[in-house]
Amino acid sequence: MTDTVETIDYSKTLYLPQTDFPMRAGLPEKEPVLVKRWQDMDLYAKLRESAAGRTKYVLHDGPPYANGNIHIGHALNKILKDVITRSFQMRGYDSTYVPGWDCHGLPIEWKIEEQYRAKGKNKDEVPVNEFRKECREFAAHWITVQGGEFQRLGVIGDFKNPYTTMAFHAESRIAGELLKFALSGQLYRGSKPVMWSVVERTALAEAEIEYQDYESDTIWAKFPVANLVVANVVDGQPAELNPDLSDRSLDLLDAHVVIWTTTPWTIPGNRAVSYSPRVAYGLYEVTAAENAFGPEPGEKLIFADALAAESQAKAKITLKRLHHVSAEQLGNLVLSHPFKGLGGGYEFPVPMVAGDHVTDDAGTGFVHTAPGHGREDFDAWMDAAPQLRARGIDTVIPFTVDDAGFFTRDAPGFGPDREGGAARVIDDNGKKGNANQAVIDELIKRNALFARGRLKHSYPHSWRSKKPVIFRNTPQWFVYMDKDLGDGTTLRSRALKAIDDTRFVPAAGQNRIRAMIEERPDWVLSRQRAWGVPIAVFADEDGNVLKDEAVNQRIMDAFEEEGADAWFAAGAKERFLGNHDASKWKQVMDILDVWFDSGSTHVFTLEDRPDLKWPADVYLEGSDQHRGWFHSSLLESCGTRGRAPYDTVVTHGFTMDEDGRKMSKSLGNTVVPQDVIKQSGADILRLWVVTTDYWEDQRLGKNVLQTNIDAYRKLRNTIRWMLGTLAHDDGETVPLEAMPELERLMLHRLAELDEVVRQGYDAFEFKRITRALVDFMVVELSAFYFDIRKDALYCDAPSSVKRKASVQVVRHLFDCLVKWLAPMLPFTMEEAWLDRHPDAVSVHLDQFPEIPADWKNEALAEKWRKVRQVRRVVTGALEIARAQKVIGSSLEAVPVVTINDAALEAAIADVDMAEMAITSDLVIAHGQAPEGAFTLDDVRGVAVVVEKAEDRGLVKCARSWRYTADVGQDPAFPDVSARDAAVLHELKALGRL
């Protein structure tokens, strides 16, 4: 018999993990295979079939621009969206995702123009619809490329039927939305200062602006007081001025009001000087001067008192304060333009107007007001316009700068009449022109320059060309923000109410967009470009829009069949006007702001597609979209439907490098998602996304990626071990009440985690989920439960209830963890699921497991918190003993545990603590703890001394490697314990030995 025993390979009698699921992931090779599998089976269609009849959940995709390969920001955005749609699908919803693309606009025009220049072609000589056709083909190419890149990230959506803003149906619906604004009277042609890109020759919306450091010329200029207001105006009627006020103002008649500006080129557009009733002003006399130009001794100047000293220093003069000048006196002054008489112009009076935007923080306390070159200037001018007109002052705002940045004839002395030609503000390359210097030279010539300097400050630039923009008065098409819409509301009030009714994640987004809506001007819709949806209206010479529903329908029908190219085709005007007199109506050839395009996507997707619904449950984009897509969608929908097109808005931050710097090619610190995918796999990138506080700016680089790779390996190895263990799963179940406490504790933890997972997905708090699951898998499973149960799982008999219960729990653990993680790591979880269920279609067609209510057991959990406290002291002592080489494996130890805490002792009374500590035996002692015993400060009343099992006469079992007192009791298997001998007999009876 002994000979027989010696021939047994005990390792073959163990239920060791068996799996082909590799430790090395090989994601770059495996993921494309799974992408193709999902595409071949049309997984998205199967998801829709499986969810038929469920409540719809719609995340509406904010359209990326169809230009170039995706970058890391795209990857972050699409992964977050995919996690949301997948998680809601697996939580029992019909969670749809239709990807979309923004196709119109300047960047694509630029690309085509670059191609033209390379071929020696002139865009202006190309028929507009031929140019538009090339733009369309360019966008279509990049939609295909980006669609493939998004799917390689693991994104599941209806990529066979995406939406695009250049689809004929979309162009028809966008035009239809514009026509709704026109019919309701919200659309108007106006003249306002807009941000204008000279380089791009178009007006820009706030969303198309970024701020960069810029060095500007600064000047202090003198405006001479010409006279006093002859008559005041009260309720539109002339009224006598206070004689005393006039008398007190007489000594101001030979004074100058000094202004300060960072845009000298706007002086020809000056029409007023603004002051503040809240600022203290004084009349000052120059007593000494050092400059070759500027004020001379004896001159009288008016400043804000708080800024007189600073102004004095700038001009290198000495000032003496004569007396206070009241706001009432300032309002009584009429100034002359410093360029009066130049080129026969500037003969108009320059009034003083009160303005809320005036402060004494910088400058002189007076603001040079050029209503054609600034929003605040425009507002101050328009507020004062009724009073000014009653005084006989012309309030028409001139067009002093043209679309190329040149001065016009409305700027005498600087326009085409100037020797050498019109001065220019900015050239075609975005560089400063000669306008500032021309203005400064003329001020010096007229002794109107007080001082000059330079200032580095934040200045608006086009986000596309990266070149500075100017504020320029132009005729444009606008949507009113504050016009009564017939029900007592305005577009602004509707939008503000909609913001209050919307859930924002994070909550700070609500205040951010609210502040923008509260302060924003009317919405400028027009762009002077070719590639886009036209402002498809007809207007008379006064700017009145033709309101004819039959005409509008013809336009929309044509766009539906032919696209918006129909507007630019020969004969379009007569075709659409029908019986209207074409000579009375002008066809508007401007195109729409692309933000109106994307702001209308909810119309031709959510409303028009039967697989979607309006409003969307959620919009998710970067935080810059508070002034972009969230903003334009809100305004468009509130203007036509009275509410927002979304219920929830989720925002994410931007991706920085590991040092918190903005990524840029010039710094060489960019992370290219395609490179990460090729080297490590998309699931690594996805793991990074879901473990970040994504609503803030995130950091990414080599070290961050390596941290995620390490975490992924731990997670993967835990899944691999479960798969190996489940190779021995025969599907048997053990009733909950018959399970050991440790198994019931694990089921309780699954019940707790189920709440964390569901609440986390509902709140879009993915980091909360991943932290909980990874900690659970690494700390509670690998280092606790699995470690403890390896003996029972590997060594116990097939009939062992403990082993059966443990296999059953591992089965539940696998099902829950794989499904919970599937939305975040779809490739790895699909691989794991198909390894366990080779005949399955996809884990993504399943739902999260329903956790039985009786798995929750708080009393048991509380007891085991105490058990684990004791265990922690024991394992701490074992680590010390192992480090001191007293023992090798913990199975060589017999800890002697002295307990002087009644609650802890009661908790472990019926627990096999040797099994919990993975030792061969464990002795509970009472009384005084031995000197030198191991303790932990945070676990009072527990002390441990580690003894060796061999010293207690225990013998090592050749099968389980545990040290016991009953090794050799069974003569059939003399080198194993009684437990292991009984198992071997059972295996032999089953024919497995």
Swiss-Prot record:
Motif ('HIGH' region): 64-74
Binding site for ATP: K665
Primary localization: cytoplasm
GO CC list: cytosol
EC number: 6.1.1.5
Enzyme class, UniProt record, top EC level: ligase
Record protein name field: Isoleucine--tRNA ligase
Source organism: Mesorhizobium japonicum (strain LMG 29417 / CECT 9101 / MAFF 303099) (Mesorhizobium loti (strain MAFF 303099))
Origin organism lineage: Bacteria, Pseudomonadati, Pseudomonadota, Alphaproteobacteria, Hyphomicrobiales
